[in-house]
């Protein structure tokens, strides 16, 4: 199946909060791409496709447990995470605080975590900031909800 034409499908997304931390480092997309494996094992591909299907189904069904189980990237994250200081610590602490899961946003260095409520999302935000403070790296953190409207043209005036 080709991605041309691109199919754009609107998902029904449950109320989720997104916590994002952006460490003040540069990760060039070209560098992040250059370290990826050119070939993957079939067992890893099968697991990744299952996780993607589980994530889409979990979002559509509002099944938080399935969303959490499916937020595992076995192809890209293990390699790219080495470019992001404290990545593993941020992910571990966030899940301990109740986040469903998360991962690398784009090629990095931003990390996102999904939570079912604002209290958890804010707790994750505080912990993310503390982790980067403890290693002497500035960061910006954000808590928001998922935009279900998609791209919109805004008046610049």
Segments from the language model and where they lie:
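ATP-dependent small-molecule kinase catalytic core of the GHMP/sugar-kinase superfamily
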Residues: 1-97, 118-157
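Short acidic/histidine-rich active-site segments
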Residues: 104-107
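Glycine-centered loop/turn positions within well-structured domains
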Residues: 109-111, 149
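Short acidic/polar active-site loop segments enriched in Thr and Asp
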Residues: 100
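Short hydrophobic/aromatic beta-strand micro-patches
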Residues: 112-116
């Amino acid at each position: 199946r080709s991605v041309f034409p691109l199919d754009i499908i609107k998902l029904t997304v449950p109320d989720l909060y997104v916590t994002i931390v952006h460490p003040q480092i540069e990760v060039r997309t070209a560098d992040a791409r250059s370290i990826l494996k050119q070939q993957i094992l079939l067992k890893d591909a099968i697991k990744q496709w299952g996780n993607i299907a589980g994530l889409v189904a979990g979002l559509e069904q509002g099944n938080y447990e399935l969303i959490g189980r499916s937020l595992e990237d076995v192809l890209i994250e293990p390699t790219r995470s080495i470019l992001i200081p404290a990545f593993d610590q941020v992910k571990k602490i966030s899940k301990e605080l109740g986040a469903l899961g998360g991962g690398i946003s784009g090629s990095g260095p931003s990390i996102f975590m999904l939570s079912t409520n604002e209290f958890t999302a804010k707790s994750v935000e505080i912990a993310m900031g503390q982790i980067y403070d403890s290693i002497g790296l500035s960061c910006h953190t954000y808590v928001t909800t998922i935009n279900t409207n998609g791209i919109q043209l805004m008046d610049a005036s």
